[in-house]
Amino acid sequence: MSKLKTKKYNAVANAEKDASQTFVKGAAILTLSMVIVKVFGLLDKVILTGIFSGVSFEQAVAGGTETVNFASFGLGLYSNAYEIFVVIFTVATGGLPIAISRLVSESTAQKRFNDVKQIHRVSIPFFVIVGILSFAILVGASFIYVQIIESPYSLLGMLCLSPTVLFGCLVSIYRGYYEGQRNMFPTAVSEIIEATIKLFIGAFLAYIIAHLGMNSYAESGTVFGLYIANQTEAYQTIVSFSVAGAIMGITLGSAASFVFYILKFKIQGDGIPEEYYRNSVEARSKRETFNKILKTAIPVAMGSLIMSVGSLIDQVIVQRVLLNMIETNPQALQAQYSKYFTADMFYADTKTIHTSLWGCYSAALTFLQLVTAVTQVFGSSAMPNVTSAWTKGNKDELKKSIETVIRLTMLFTFPMALGMMALSFPIMGLVYNDPLITDVGGRILLIMGVTTIFGAASTPVCSMLQGIGRVDLPMKLYTVCMAVKIGITWMFVSVPEINVQGATVGSMITYAIMTIVGMYLLIKYSKIKPDLFGTTVKPLIGAIASAASAFGAYHLMESIIGSARMSIAVSLAVSIFVAVIVYIAVLLILRFPQ
């Protein structure tokens, strides 16, 4: 009994609280952590952009010299490292944590506490095996993928990232378990640990490696012992090593997150007092439990896999189409980007431009992911509540949970998305301070604002479908939507005047279909009709007013204090402050929420 006294958290008592209270509390905890994580992630990209920009040299041109830097190239390599990783990581961890969360929540609602323990026991060996296999597959796949996208400099970063899939599987053993108990605190802490190490250790390693690489090349003409005759290739090699250092911060962060979970579980136990086990029915057999986990996990994992593979194909198409465009019709891109790339890059060094343009897309994508990450939190927090209400057959609680998720999602998403559209160019200019990224990324972010609305809404909608037991529906929906996305992306990116910006159009249409059809299916199968008008229209009106005020305030400030980087920061701060005040005022006038 002495061990029980060390427990500071009672999972059963928490599960018996009002669903809306636990949802709001869980969402608040995860939202706070996610904001910290995404701010750290944004700072990481800002710092890395500065580091990669520092890897530069002066090149003689007609009438003088110009600086050649590798900021967008470095961001492109950084993004490429994630592409194949995301697919394999999703297969390894995409379905099982959600399955464990749902089954733990369901078993707790049914007071089958021995099943809760059995679920945890059965998941451990399975996750370990999956993690080791996924790590080995990722290492092998990295060598193939760099050949497909013709980006050999991406390989080192991919290899440094590969251990993360193993640690991610080990973390998932505990993350799904705690989330199923409506305890979001461990997830929040572990994510902050990962983000902190990624930011500080990763940036430190990237800087040191870039600094040592440039010194090595200046003194001996070699990069860490490698003789490279061409100066551009030498600096690209330095950037690839620097990117690998930054990615090592991610791997170390995931390892530290796993250590945190191990220590927490050993010190505090599983959160279920011993008397609940004694009074519970006997647990299902390990085989039955394992089959139940797989039955729930496979459709979820397949849906996530389809999304990831679709995105991977999408990314390959974008880069291959851009590369083909450079090789067959360089004049079309040169007319648009001649001030950012030397003539040799369009005709001789053709493997740099498509990676750099992809880096611009990746830079803008960071802001969409900031919003969708928060709404994904709403979906994760809603899952146990929706599952519990559905299991109990409590229609009122289910309706309340669904409406709360929609309301919070729209309340957060609308102002963020429209604000990004209104301030796209100054945001990119301030954050990255690179002419190419500001120009191309600003145009992408402008379109991406609409994409953000549907992308942010689709995740919690699919989570709620899984919560009511229809884990198969998101998978089917993802399959159709990814096919649409690939076709639209190919069509738009192939137009030289649109090029990389076309990837955003495909995403926008895909997420719109996913959200609208997903909501229809949720209403159909839950037999619940949420108040969509009341939960969406008022936040939209407030967001339009706030975005308009932000746009006006920024340009007024710009006309007064100019457009230097510090001036942009001041103008953005003032415009965002004005937008927040206007948004709150409009919501109060409209009495939202009632």
What are these regions (language model features)?
Residues M1-L43, N114, Q118, S280-V300, ...:
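N-terminal membrane topogenesis motif
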Residues D18-I98, F135, V165, P299, ...:
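Signature of the first transmembrane helix
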Residues V37, T93-I98, C160-E179, T187-A195, ...:
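Short runs within selected transmembrane alpha-helices of multi-pass transporters and secretion channels
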Residues G94-A109, A364, T375-K392:
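Helix-loop junctions and terminal segments of transmembrane helices
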Residues F185, T196-V259, D472, M482-I516, ...:
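Membrane-interface helix-loop junctions in multi-pass transport and translocation proteins
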